[in-house]
Amino acid sequence: MPQLSKSLSFDGRDIRLELGLFAPQAGGSVLISSGDTAVLVAATRSTAREGIDFLPLTVDYEERMYAAGRIPGGFLRREGRPPERATLTSRLIDRPLRPLFPSWLRDDLQVVATTLSMDETVPPDVLAATGASIATLVAKIPFYGPMAAVRVGLVGDDFIINPTYREIEKGDLDLVVAGTPAGVIMVEAGANQLPEADVIEAIDFGYEAVQELIKAQQSLLAELGIEQILPEAPNADNTLENFVRDRASSGVQQVLQHFSFTKSERDAALDEVKASVVEAIAALPEEDPVRSVTAAEPKALGNTFKALTKTLMRQQILRDGVRVDGRKLDQVRPISSQVGLLPPRVHGSGLFQRGLTQVLSIATLGTPGDAQELDDLHPDTQKRYLHHYNMPPYSVGETRPMRSPGRREIGHGALAERALLPVLPSKEEFPYVIRVVSEVLSSNGSTSMGSVCGSTLALMDAGVPIKKPVSGAAMGLIREGDEYRVLTDIQGIEDFLGDMDFKVAGTDQGITALQMDMKIHGLPLEIIADAINQAKPARLHILNKMLEAIATPRADLSTYAPRLFRIQINPEQIGLVIGPGGKTIRSITEQTGAKIDIEDTGAVTISAVDADSALRAKSIIEGMTRTITAGDVYIGKVTRIIPIGAFVEFLPGKEGMIHISQIADYRVARVEDELTVGDEVVVKVREIDQKGRVNLTRKGIDPEEVSAARAAVEAS
């Protein structure tokens, strides 16, 4: 392929494309850059796999630490398992890309995006998503593209395209929009309780920029002389389809209209209908075409029956406006919320159930040292709020090996985490590190939004002073031509057989998180707006049900939660608290049993299993760092005696010396005649010398000063 360079501009930011220079043996590749961030994306196609009924597409996003001029940590000093954010970026690329391949394609496809260079300004994820479309088109893989993605930020009252990390942090919106010529195909967003109208406007704003990138890709293909392949499905033999439709349509319709069925009863009834078709096929002569098809393709019957069920369910919703469980299109399943179900060793817990979906969320409070250290290319290096999502096989009545979290679990956990971030208290207000684990105990659709609701309950039960409670709902879509129906609170079968899964989370003030995935090639803004607006009353209904279990965060933390105190010291005194080689801070920890975390700003967080230990450590540090002036009066204890005087600890960790001449108003021959180690004495600061040493006296102290000093001790 000849080398080709192209440059585009958005809001003063350039996007540069380089083709034909890298990865010559890949099916198609592009280096896509903006600022000093550069991502190489390669797409490759292999021959079709035999005997599969799905598209074997793999999308991998790879980060290399050299991209930021860094060497990886760890013993091996090389990249290992992808960090969580890299996994989320892989999903961000995959989700708008996957629906655009034809359903009949069985070729092995792999898209690999590698960040080769990265500055601390431009995020690489949307570049990688757009690059994936370009690489796929250049590779001449059957594809209903082009597809492009942009990020939309909101700084003040202005939307901006592809904001920098700093602009994202300052703004109230971080939204990624991906689209095709047919419309919007994917949305992912975190927002600071934005109204629905603002989010819809942002999606529209982003899609306008997406269209420019789509036109640029079409122009690029023309320059390269590549004719886009618009795939056509191979000619299919309808013999089996007609047979199944004739034998099973009536039975499937009866099952779908039996609204009192539970999920398991419905599944069993559909299996019975399918079994009757199997019996009918078995009774056919061996040379019958239907029997020949099922013998040659063992999965053909199952796929055909599934397609029939999908068609009939969709027709029922479009025609009658009624769903398989009898609900109206905008109706939410029955809801149950409970808190504090687990023993008190657990800091906070919430059980949320919506229909057959049940999520148990558990909140744990930790110290600042429990924050997750992040070793990736993102500017953020720590996380103080963690949400982890688990979905064991028993949640869907299945058995399979238990594995470490996969991409789905990581993605669902991150979405629920994002939904709660805007309402969490600041580190200054609530210095705890917070971890919530959502255990999906039963799944029938919308477990990620169930995790949002369960997380809210668990945090409130744990006494975390969240600004607002958050709830979430998953919206679905059935669309045939220009006719469509938006479904509220979709269950498993509607998710599986529908066209859209649109998750919306937020408070009574506005949206905090969005995630929209498609199975079709794009949607107009009108339908997206309908889904967002229809989600609001559902969210508020769910929220009101949750608040029946717990209306406000608990006033007190669990007895078993660590106790934290946060104080501010002069950054110049950090060395004083730490001491040479950490000697002083270790001594405080050994004396009190408390854990001490000091930030570069001078913020000190003191934590312990009980309040008394933390308060003792707090008192010591405050004493060490307190500003002492001549004339201050303290109550102290004698710690050492030397021939010329005595040392007194007048503040925790702070000592001064009383010279023998300052012990009494009369002449003292021996210090031991007046003082012994352990004596409580009232002392006044006489002076602080040039070396910072404190000289004390017992002379000239008024009774009022003694009373004030004793009152200060009692108050502390």
UniProtKB/Swiss-Prot annotation:
Keywords: Cytoplasm, Magnesium, Metal-binding, Nucleotidyltransferase, RNA-binding, Transferase. SUPFAM superfamilies: Eukaryotic type KH-domain (KH-domain type I), Nucleic acid-binding proteins, Polynucleotide phosphorylase/guanosine pentaphosphate synthase (PNPase/GPSI), domain 3, Ribonuclease PH domain 2-like, Ribosomal protein S5 domain 2-like. Gene3D superfamilies: GHMP Kinase, N-terminal domain, K Homology domain, type 1, Nucleic acid-binding proteins. HAMAP family: PNPase. Its EC number is 2.7.7.8. This is Polyribonucleotide nucleotidyltransferase. Residues 562-621 form the KH domain. It is an enzyme of class 2 (transferase). It catalyses: RNA(n+1) + phosphate = RNA(n) + a ribonucleoside 5'-diphosphate. InterPro entries: ExoRNase_PH_dom1, ExoRNase_PH_dom2, ExoRNase_PH_dom2_sf, KH_dom, KH_dom_type_1, KH_dom_type_1_sf, NA-bd_OB-fold, PNPase. The gene is pnp.
